[in-house]
Amino acid sequence: MDRSVPDPLPRSAPRTPAMQPAGSAGKRRFMKMFHAHSKNDFVRIKNHKFLPLHICQSRKTKGKAPLPPAETKGTDVSSAEDPVESTAVVTEQQDNMIDKDIELSVVLPGDILKSTTVHGSKPMMDLLVFLCAQYHLNPSSHTIDLLSAEENLIKFKPNTPIGMLDVEKVILKPKSLDKKKPTPIIPEKTVRVVINFKKTQKTIVRVSPHAPLQDLAPIICSKCEFDPLHTVLLKDYQAQEPLDLTKSLNDLGLRELYAMDISRESCQISHNPDIVKEKENKGIFSFFQRSKKKREQTASAPATPLVSKHRPSFTRSNTISKPYISNTLPSDAPKKRRAPLPPMPTSQGAAQGQERRASCVERSTSVDDTDKSSSEAIMVRTGSLQLSSTSIGTSSLKRTKRKAPAPPSKTPLAQTDERNSAMAHGLPLEDGIAPDSMLELSSPEGMSTPEGSLGPGFLSQEQCAVPKPPDEISEGPGTPETAVASLTSGVSSDYSLEEIDEKEELSEASKDPAGSISVKSPDIASASTDMRITVEKDPDSALGISDGETSPSSKGKTQEGRSTEGQGPYHPVVGHIGNEDRVSDSIKDMKTLGPNQESVVQNEIMVCATSTDYVKNRPGKMETTIEGEGEALKKASDMETDRLSGSPACRMDNVKSSRENHLTASPGPDQKLNQPGVEKTKMQDAAIQATPARGTFDGNHEVSNSSDPRADETVQTSDGSISAQHSSASLQDSVNASREFRSQGTSTYVQDRLPEKEPACTYGNNVPLSPVDGSNKNPAASYLKNFPLYRQDSNPKPKPSNEITREYIPKIGMTTYKIVPPKSLEMAKDWESEAMGRKDDQKMLPVGQRHTIENMTETSMQTEVPATSKSSQQPQPDLKPKPSSGTERHLHRTLSSPTGTETNPPKAPRVTTDTGTIPFAPNLEDINNILESKFRSRASNPQAKPSSFFLQMQKRASGHYVTSAAAKSVHTAPGPAPKEPTIKEVQRDPQLSPEQHPSSLSERTHSAPLPNISKADDDIIQKPAETSPPPVAPKPMTLRAETSPPPVFPKPMTLPAETSPPPVFPKPMTLPAETSLPLVFPKPMTLRAETSPPPVAAKPVALPGSQGTSLNLKTLKTFGAPRPYSSSGPSPFALAVVKRSQSFSKACPESASEGSSALPPAATQDEKTHTVNKPTVGSQHGDGDKQNNPVQNEHSSQVLTPADGPSFTLKRQSSLTFQSSDPEHVRQSLLTAIRSGEAAAKLKRVTVPSNTISVNGKSGLSQSMSIDAQDSR
């Protein structure tokens, strides 16, 4: 064996056999493990033939890892050769021990000796748990000690089997707590006790509330550093009786004590501080010491009580707000202010002269200290300002220092100007900060006194309020206002930071125009507040907008300026009245100022970028408006509003706002004069703000914008509404429609589209919108002019707002795919041709139909019908914008609402879903037009499939759909019952039936088509050859034929004339009595269930009637959508229908004689299936067949036209009518067929293979239909 070798690769395959001598079972077991590892390693080595040797050795090391885990008792692994043999021996012994039960003696905690038997394979942890459970001990609090036969402790691991250890005795003992931390002792409840000592000192001690005071005394004394022998505990300083030391704090109910040191020294010491304090209180230094204490106590407050208490002697006479404002400065500033105080007389009762001298000293010191810190100077200035009223020179110094912290400005000029202004006003302005602009404005008016006017006078007061002595302040409006004025005036350094920033802005803005303002330029430069005031009051009042425009330059601020009417946004305290007075005064001043005013306006323009455009032009305009007074303003505002908003709503808003502005500003005649300017300027502001957004207003059109922001908004919103309103019959309707559109968000479609093109019309000219005024003679034309362009532009890239709802509206039977530009082009072409046909057809539409169409709002076709009615009323170009049902729908919403179908827009959304259930049936002509446009759009969109979400409801399995139709008919059973007689009546008098039975869907559908048919019969017959096929075929066939026309729907695409597929109904209509009702019913039946036609007779027919119109195209297309349900063979339902139709035809000898018998039941079935198939085919092959279908339809219509023989169709339909007369019977048959489930599927399946095949663009179905029709004839 190779064991003597170092064995670099002990696990290699060749060595494995050598390493397996016939040994003990333990050794064999070990070798098995070893061999397994060596195998794995060998495979690895084999796979990696070029591994270096050290890697193999490392693998060897890994192989040894699984050596026996237990440390056997007597084993000594000393040499490299012994491990295998020794381990094998130990393993064998352990195996023997593990496999047998072991007798153990167990020593329980009370030295109780027990014996137990345990299997050798039980791990030690399990043994502990087992023994503890056996003897009812807690294993978590006990441990196991193992003793060998020699009474030696055996070390073990928790998972070591007991059999592997030579155990004689097991000791269960509680875990020793010595090694662990002692269990935490529950802390004693303690409370915080406040210990007062030495009168003014406090400390806090936490003690037990239950311990007697005598136990707490040492703790308290140590805390207070008293001698426990000389310490007495009192309730408080006043109490002379010591507390009972035997009682606890809880007994006494105390949480605060007073510790008194009764020793003589401590008493003396305690008295001395009191005396010293009392003396200090009388002296000057007491102030500082107090201030220090209080500052320590109130370190968090920036303002120290020192300033507040020490200053009142000076400041009470002056504005009280000053010292407090100054207190807001950093805490270090007060310290510097205190420096000059020591020289002051010690007595607080010193004369004011002394105080003023002191103030002068402070002033000088502050001047000296200005270099040290601007805050210091500010502090001194504030103090000196209060005292500075006496001397002008000092005031100038103060002013200079005051201005230093202010935004950069021309201080000397400002000072001189301020002094001049103060002199002019005769106001004792200590600060000398009367705004020159105020002087100019107020002085011409002779308003030198603050009482003269709240405007400039008040401003001067405000500015001077801070420096003024109390007398002048008393004259002022009040300290709070003066404080506000001081803030606004910027005279003192105490004004708020916001004002400082604003002043800086104003001063900077005014620097450039300052030169033009001879006297004002210094004011503006030096005191931004003056500029502010002038801007806020005079210029603003004169301009009326400057307040809102200059500082805010935003609508919110402009609104604020408007509400205040010249009131400075920074003088809210002054009040509206004061502002208005100031406005009037400032207007007068502006008049007097003339060029100055203009310069001020220019300055304001600098401030407000928004108003610059017309602020420049404003002075002249304002003067004219002021001269023209309120009337001119009203006229102007009215003119502007008229221009802006053709709709009365906008006018009303504009006029309203202008009048409100007049009222607000009209307190006095001056205000009226000012107000026109203000209003006009405000209107201009609004216009300017609005114009950039629209970019359609002309330069002259600035004024035309609404004076009120609301009006402006209405105008903006009305842009779209106005465009929609062009098509409205009256302004009121348009306004309402626009409002409805806004509320519903439906107008966005029109707004997005129309405004783009119509803005030129609406706003491009200042001339009022004549179409909006109600001169929309051809709203559709105006709409179409822009709309086709919009379609072309927008289809490729739908606008984000319209992507979901407007721009891309799913067409009937179409999946919700984005419209591709090529489609739009094709659609436009189709629509043009379609429009031509529709124009002719629409011309033929009776007025009654139009009204009925308007009333169709409840119909699922509401949106579509109104659109078609409009198209009928309007030139066909309308159809171009309507290429897609989505567009039609939106147009219908936007346009129909203007046309008086305002109720439609809200209802429009449900149009597609409710198609089958709506009580009102739109005229077939209109529906056909709509459907044609939609299906043509589909034709143009070959990818479009009849899966628009609107038709999801209609995309059910044909059987399911029929079920729904039958159910609906059941629900509308009252309707169907009347419909049956109505059907008969209609057959007798088809044209009357529509009017007589407008309520019933089928009848209504027929009635609508009948008038249309009467006029559009020729077109319908020719184009809606589709309709003719229904009459030709037996009722089932008629249904099939009608169904086939749905495939013809493409033809509606080609036939610009109203939706030829609906004409299918009209064609029955055309066969006035005959097809009108029966065909319509059957067709809906065919459309819905394809096999439903026979049941159509009753309620199903009625539902299809309403649906039929909508379904002519919609449902047929949608039926095409559920292709998986198409059936290839006549389903039981179809057979039942055929049988029923045959039975009816037999029942009616007329139909049989006319040739219903000519078509055998099989033929009828075939035709039925074919016709049904054709609708499916049409829907499926709509793209390809649509082009073919027109021809096919024409052919079928030609063939069917003879088949239209009124007698035959009437009889066939009369049989249908008879069926409908027995609604329950029909319903049962329908239900049975539907339940079979195979009927619809088979029908459609058959449809696809049999009829879908198109020969030369003509579907076999239509040809077969025509042949069948001819045969039947």
From Swiss-Prot:
**Lineage of producing organism:** Eukaryota, Metazoa, Chordata, Craniata, Vertebrata
UniProt feature, compositional bias: Polar residues: 314-330, 383-397, 485-495, 702-750, 763-779, 860-876, 894-904, 993-1002, 1187-1200
Q: Which residues carry this modification: Phosphothreonine?
A: T183, T304, T328
**Known InterPro entries for this protein?**
COBL-like, Cordon-bleu_ubiquitin_domain
**Tissue-specific expression:** Detected in embryonic first branchial arc, branchial clefts and limb buds.
* MF terms (GO), sorted A to Z: actin monomer binding
Motif window: KKRRAP 2: 400-405
Does this UniProt record's set of keywords contain Phosphoprotein? yes
Residues found modified as Phosphoserine: 248, 266, 300, 317, 366, 373-374, 384, 396, 518, 521, 541, 546, 551, 554, 645, 666, 770, 869, 896-897, 993, 999, 1028, 1092, 1214-1215, 1266
Regions of compositional bias (Basic and acidic residues) in chain numbering: 354-374, 631-643, 653-662
**Listed name of the protein:** Cordon-bleu protein-like 1
Mark out the compositionally biased spans (Acidic residues): 496-505
Residue ranges annotated for the WH2 domain, each copy included: 1226-1246
